[in-house]
């Protein structure tokens, strides 16, 4: 029991540290990718090739003056960024980061917890994320902050519905709500992307909107809202909001890789590697390779596509993605009936 508890604590700390490190260097990668796409050099002053730029940015944020507007709600003003940063860490506990490690006759799963309602937990926690933005925008007592927060809330709530419906079709196919079981079912080339291509397309578009990334970055639209919901924030509170975006991007990429691209499963590797622990380690490395690829896709889309107008954003969510998600559920049900999986 004590060993199990220690292992779980190690897993929590490891996932927390990896998310922090990935979030830090996602900022560096974003600036380098943007520079490449715009034929620039990018960060190259802090350390060799600029690899210490995230550290420099963190020190800069930490050293800036901490300012709280006089007419703001101080308690909620502090709670907003803390909540925004806490939510993505809470979602990471149900993601399977690998298979089982066999140590001294015991099996240790590379997952903090594999609850049988993992998908429901994931969506329940993600839906709370809107409070971090709404509280911060409202507590700032600034019209631009409030408008940005209202935009973010309506956008996230709208796209959560289409995202949820896309997952319903996947749950129908896999017959489980456990993310651990979903990953285990995708051994070999039995990836869910081949069975749910439309669901994946809907899910990834909604993921862009949920993380407030371009072309869905209307809550932070500088040309209209100054800085959006974090206009009045400075120092580490602003850093929390900006950092939360990159950790959300990391978690979203991990969820996409797990639900649709086999997670830690690596096709054909079992023919060449027979040690179960090495298979687990290589599978985890393969999962992180997929995550890095999807983080690159997030950044590539941001620096390639222009921002939507707000009416276009709402039309896409309600008039296109929602009917497509419902049609996907109907098509999945019909195919399952025709193949004899349901009666």
PLM-predicted stretches and their roles:
Residues 1-343:
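Selective transmembrane helix interface/packing segments
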